Amino acid sequence: MTEATAGRVQRYILDGSDEELRRLLSVSEVTAGAARRAFGRAGVSPGWAAIDCGCGPIGALAVLAELVGPAGRVVGVDVSELAVTRARSVANALQLGNTEVVAGDIHRLDPAALGGPFDLAFTRLFLMHQADPVQSLRAIARLVRPGGWIIVHEPLRDPPPRSHPHLDALDAYWGMLHDVLEQAGVPRGTVESLPAAARAAGLDVASADGFFILGEPESVFEIHASTLAAFKPTAVQCGIAAQTVDDVLTSLRAGQAGGYEWVSTPFFLDLALRKPRS
């Protein structure tokens, strides 16, 4: 994030009255740098219109809002009304006047109704949940102008997140998440096959890279624990014992108390896709 946005984030983390929002902003800082670098490579600049697909409660809204500036605009979309409510709280707290957050399904959105087409679309932790990523990428491409960009940050199943010292709960949680996704109809290897899916969707793969992030245990363990807590109901519906989920969750939260040098995110596939000009 630039100094202006980062400063507002830090002030809210230190002094904000909404504990949950403070937590979300702390978590967002872990991935802000990777998003900023990807947007920079795509040439995001003042005046651009950008959309964060599946933005959740914060996504990359703050980074995009800063990059496109007052002359640009950012739209965040999520299917969850609760996530949209939280994202609006983030935008208000950070005074992101160029940002709008709406509830909707990416597959059914009308670009014109959102003020599109957009110069750039972004997904993180979104395509990993899609049973038909080709269809999802086509839907996202409809939101983008010819020649526009789609930046994709999606985590691979292997390797799982790591820590030092090693924590078995990280392996258990990451494997559990992917077992649930497969039972929900997401094909194994969905993220690994995204470059092929992009080409099948009619997109050009401008670059394919990858990254993981090492962070402070308190923040990164919180990312993993909150992810597990969010999918616990679905895991239980898929036949995983609630106590099994709770045991892993307890281990992840205990890691926040100390004893670890570092914790990593999963390894993210970093794709820069481009919609053909004709």
Stretches with model-predicted labels:
Residues 151-219, 234:
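Conserved catalytic/acceptor-binding region of the Class I
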Residues 51-111:
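Class I SAM-dependent methyltransferase SAM/SAH-binding core
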Residues 134-149:
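A short glycine-rich, Lys/Arg-flanked "PGG" loop and its adjoining helix->strand segment in the class I
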Residues 111-120:
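A short acidic, Gly/Pro-enriched loop at the edge of an enzyme's catalytic core
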